[in-house]
Amino acid sequence: MDQTTLTGKSVIDSFEGEYEFLSNFYNCPVTYKGITYNNSEAAFQAQKVTDVYTQVRDFTGVTASVAKKLGRHCSLRPDWNDIRVDEMRAIVLQKFLQNPRLEKRLLDTGTATLIEGNWWNDKFWGVCKGEGCNMLGLILMEVRDYISKLRGAYLTSPEKLEPIDYLYD
């Protein structure tokens, strides 16, 4: 499948406009660990605390912006830095598996490189002024490859796909 025939782009460098659905701030329900959130950002921010009551009380029914603000002011679980990437990966996977229209749109990005370009200086999850780890972009590409393999529509040759252990648990 030629990526150019899908999006016409080899790099998607921001999650705005027609690619806003790639953002964690995109409004779509995500159920994670039995709790339904309005968006994947709220689901992610809720994982910063271990108390389910707090997760439900503070993070369900809120916008992504409110969830992010709440996440900045909560007491972080002690293992947060160790688990945050795995939590993000699992939440992003659920976002697309639970929303077939978004799953199709993700697959329609073909083999485009996905970059969480931003101006707010997030150099861990994204890229700002050409610098950053782009963890969200990498996770989205990983999830895209996994779903394409799951659905039998390989974007890369099957032998090039590495097993993603967390997805098979």
Task: Give, region by region, the residue ranges found by the protein language model.
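Charged, low-complexity intrinsically disordered segments
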Residues: 1-169
